[in-house]
Amino acid sequence: EYCLQEAGCSLEDIDSIAINTQPTANYLKKIMHVLKYRVSISLIRDRFKNAIARKSLRDSLKECFPKQKFVGEIKNIEHHLAHLSSSFHVSPYEKATVVSVDGFGDFSSGCWGVGTGEKIEIEGRVYYPHSLGSFYQAITQFIGFPNYGDEYKVMGLAPYGKPAYLDKMKKIVLLKPDGTYSLDLRYFIFHKDKVSYEWDGGLPFVGRLFSDELINLLGPMRNSADKLSQFHMDIAASAQAMFEEALFHMLNTLYSRHGLDNLCLAGGCGNNSVANGKILSMTNFKNIYVAASAGDAGGAIGAAYSTYFEENKRNVKDTAMRHAYLGPEFDNVDISAILKKYIKELPSEDFSINLIDSVEDLSQKTAEALTKGKVVGWFQGRMEWGPRALGNRSILGDPRRSDMKEILNIKIKRRESFRPFAPSILREYVSEWFEQDDEVPFMMKVFPIKESQRSKIPAVTHVDGSGRLQTVCSETNPRYHSLIKAFHSMTGVPIVLNTSFNENEPIVYSPEQALNCFLRTKMDVLVLNDYFICRR
């Protein structure tokens, strides 16, 4: 509905709807898998239910748009082709090696080839059940993080450990001479038994993927309520090291084969920002593009572009995605109306509300609040596309304060202490603060912070001296750039701490959601466009 509204058209105007799955893909391999592994009846039944649900899209459209009629074509785009398109077709490259790695989709877990112009030629695949994504998810569960998407916790935990169990990980993930990999399936059950996907306390819970053989190999698994030990940290470090070794094994093979300097990476494993940050140093690729949404959500863009480029030429200048500010926006009129609605919750004796229509003045006032240790909710312009808050739906803090992580966790986040917060840095200063100099607009890479600078920004320096940075340019986000520039003028540090604007919920998208989060937590300041709201 939002996309139709933004485009100024109705459902009747749409020629095609593209979906990032093709149920008939690799059909013969699916049959052979069922016969080989004696797959449980419940798993087969679930797969058929999913296939039937996907075919009812026209019925879903009728329910959502009862007054409109869709007369166009529904196109199914193979899962990994959509992933590859979601990165290559929005990259600034005319030609690149393209790679997709994830859990699995349409019965494959890895896919690679070459993108040229609007065309993507797929050269090879790794087929289900052999999957780097499933390996990483299984180890995530083993460490005691059972929910879907918890892999980022393992990334955050890994620097606290050492890869002491890498030799055992190499018994689980087997590297092949052709650059691919396979799993020793003795350590898993997901390929033959039904794995439950359920909601538990508002969180998506995934059933166990691994067998008792994995416990026999590694040791006792952790229950989520148990305290994390050095053993778990070492397991996390070992899993991350194994993932990186397998990924770089594939990438180096592909570079040797094609000799192309450009790489486009996609798939859920493309969210492993630690590995992404090492690609330039561990391979011969010169340029890397990881899309703002590397996972399955990004497949929507990939499916759309795959369909579009079947009949249209590609102009890199028109399609290159240099920022992720594509979502809803609200003007001061909208915000004023909401503030009037909440007037009783914002009494003047407890809150001050000021309208500051100068970007420079607003930046100065916000930067000043940050220097005083205030926690600032920063709500500006269009919402970000993808999983990261990139300066339009962000909570900000002073990176110089060693206690800022604790302050944020006490006031708002209440998350695990080992998880790092991210630095947003002015693009022009990256080389002065980080060991690598690169554009990272979507916060998809982790770089080492220069040793001489680490003590200056303890709140965004992880235990291993790294930071998952976002580079900020005046061309793509002038208001956020102005704020960081003002903070730099006051402190000599061109960096602010940036975390997502939420409290154990999806990132806020509307002023009302932002205001509710502000009132519900102990946030000090809320900046809604030009409105500066401060607790007294």
Question: What residue ranges belong to the model's regions?
Answer:
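N-terminal cofactor/phosphate-binding cores enriched in small/glycine residues
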Residues: E1-Y27
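Phosphate/ATP-binding catalytic cores across multiple sugar-kinase/actin-like superfamilies
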Residues: A237-L263
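Flexible beta->alpha loop and helix N-cap segments adjacent to enzyme active/binding sites
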Residues: A7-S10, K30-L43, K49, R54, ...
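Helix-hairpin-helix/helix-loop-helix acidic hairpins
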Residues: R222-A236, Q240-E245
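Short, flexible active-site loop motifs that bind/organize anionic cofactors or intermediates
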Residues: L4, A237, N504
